[in-house]
């Protein structure tokens, strides 16, 4: 496998820490050891997160092409668009963000706080569009790219989640290589890695990275899209493309993509009672915050899998914390009593 042939623009602090979740593990019976890899703490650029790790591989391509404007898309409380805005500000580039109405949630300040507030503060051209949720390419995004060109700019297209991009899976191949180095220091290997999946390139990159030592199917995706068939197809497609690019040396089979569909409801961006319980439990036991859209759902999935005995006793499970906490302010009514 050859990730090193791809240029990488450093936007993160370096390897993200692995933190034992001792109190949560004990609360769930102590038979499974839970850890978190804190990609939510990976950068000084507007709170960072998993997209910042991905952007390290997209930015060299943007600069090599002489682009002057980063153009991306997400929901109103998109972590992706906030991280793209931060990177654009850091590099002195322009930024156009298409923010669609992906979440059926209504709050008086939903479009004025959290991620979208930060994007505006960092100088991004934020464009609100009423279209609903979908992980595919969007006409509103293509229109924004055309608008930048019409105005004489040179846009760089960054799809939702950095995912359906030729280089979108590379960052989390690097995540797997980083984990292997940390495992050597810790003196043990993780039996499972739990990760939230929506647009797919985070899990896809992990699948490829961990396939290098036979652990592709130990990456347990927790669907948060509530459209798992579409998400699964995109994970597999991105993983296969990424495997070819990094010269993995083996095919990615459909069985290498494990996606648990039980925790994504009721729909994208809306938590269920299990999501909210998991958010509160992790906060109170560990002081670790998760959000209602992504990490709360993957935390719920991990907790339930422990409770149901789906991880064998003695397993060491690594939870990939991808970020998302800036969106909590937009859901303040849900947590008005804690």
Swiss-Prot record:
Pfam families: PALP. GO terms for biological process: 1-aminocyclopropane-1-carboxylate metabolic process; amine catabolic process. It catalyses: 1-aminocyclopropane-1-carboxylate + H2O = 2-oxobutanoate + NH4(+). Its cofactor is pyridoxal 5'-phosphate. Keywords: Hydrolase, Pyridoxal phosphate. Transmembrane segments: none annotated. The active site is at 78 (nucleophile). Its EC number is 3.5.99.7. The modification N6-(pyridoxal phosphate)lysine is found at residue 51. Signal peptide: none annotated. One of its GO terms (molecular function) is 1-aminocyclopropane-1-carboxylate deaminase activity. It comes from the Bacteria. Homotrimer. Belongs to the ACC deaminase/D-cysteine desulfhydrase family. Catalyzes a cyclopropane ring-opening reaction, the irreversible conversion of 1-aminocyclopropane-1-carboxylate (ACC) to ammonia and alpha-ketobutyrate. Allows growth on ACC as a nitrogen source. This is 1-aminocyclopropane-1-carboxylate deaminase.
